[in-house]
A protein has these predicted regions:
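Iron-sulfur (Fe-S) cluster-binding modules
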Residues: 1-55, 64-66, 70-78, 101-292
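Short gly/pro/ser/thr-enriched loop/turn and capping motifs at secondary-structure boundaries
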Residues: 85-90
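Short, hinge-like loop/turn segments at secondary-structure boundaries
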Residues: 96-100
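Short glycine-/small-residue-rich Rossmann-like dinucleotide-binding loops
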Residues: 58-60, 84
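Short aromatic-enriched loop/helix-cap "lid" or pocket-rim segments at secondary-structure transitions
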Residues: 93
Length: 292
């Protein structure tokens, strides 16, 4: 029987919950694997040896995360990035838009503050720029999403148990959406609180929808109920960079509405989940290395 472990780094636990949301199917799955590590289900603190499949949730934020990640990699035959934080850095990666020291000063020395104004440094891990786990170890499979789809988690584990390569979506959310893709250019950009017209592409109506550049697999759940896709599953297979891809699309569709582009202002849209793994982040890291 294959040995399965779920290991958490910087995480809110949402991906772990997505695994548990298999409900009764989880019982069938646990009949095929031995769950040897899970902070929600197994009373065991240390990472065990001889892991066949390790699911890693959360991105890297501290030096402790790096050590834990490398330990998991050394003890695992197959390592899977579970969720968009592990795959791309996730929403915490937007903090990389700001200077790390300034961010720490704001949290610990800002006004008002509930701390003594001292940044912890003794006997605690160092805080670093947010990064996907692939920046430090080899990743064998990615299951993105915030959170990932429980069914996709199950299907991936079942395939790995059988020694098969799990199938991965090759299309975009737009391909899964009954409303899109857009057939005409939007006349203006709409706010998310404005009620959409039913049965019409949201991007076409002027809502900021990431569907054209986002990996399929969710069934376009958000656009189907009138909520624009926010790109939580990361870039579509053929998109080199999610933010650059959607910016390119918007230049074609609505150039006049985005001519006052601001990296810090718009990155929460273009790179909500993928800034830490973006081309821009690579350039920022290179610039920081040159300064040293």
């Amino acid at each position: 029987m294959k040995r399965l472990a779920i290991i958490s780094l910087m995480s809110d636990g949402g991906c772990h919950i997505a695994f548990l949301e298999l409900h009764e199917e989880l019982l069938h799955l646990l009949g095929q694997v031995e769950l040897i590590h899970s902070y929600m289900l197994v009373d065991r603190r240390e990472i065990p040896e001889h892991i066949d499949i390790a699911l890693i949730e959360g991105g890297v934020r501290t030096t402790h995360d790096i050590e834990l990640l490398k330990e998991a990699r050394s003890k695992s035959k197959i390592l899977v990035a579970l969720g968009s934080c592990a795959c791309f850095g996730g929403i915490p990666g937007l903090s990389n838009l700001y200077d790390l020291r300034a961010s720490l000063d704001y949290v610990y020395r800002g006004t008002p503050t509930t701390t003594e104004g001292v940044i912890p440094h003794e006997n605690v891990p160092s805080v670093i720029r947010v990064a996907p786990i692939s920046r430090f170890v080899q990743v064998d499979l990615q299951i993105p999403g915030c959170p990932p789809e429980p069914e996709e988690i199950k299907e991936a584990i079942v395939s790995l148990i059988k020694g098969e390569v799990p199938s991965q979506p090759s299309k975009t959310v737009c391909d899964e959406c009954e409303l899109g893709p857009p057939k005409e250019k939007p006349r203006r950009l709409r706010k998310i609180y404005e009620p959409p017209e039913p049965d019409r592409c949201l991007l076409e109506q002027g809502y900021f929808c990431m569907g054209p550049v986002t990996r399929a697999g969710c069934g376009a759940k958000c656009p189907r109920i009138g909520v624009p896709c926010d790109g939580c599953s990361g870039p579509a297979p053929k998109a080199l960079d999610q933010g650059i891809s959607i910016l390119d699309a918007l230049v074609t569709l609505a150039y006049k509405n985005i001519e006052n582009f601001s990296l810090k202002q718009h990155s929460a849209y273009f790179y909500r989940y993928t800034f830490a793994s973006s081309v821009i982040e690579d350039l920022l890291r290179k610039k920081l290395r040159e300064r040293r």
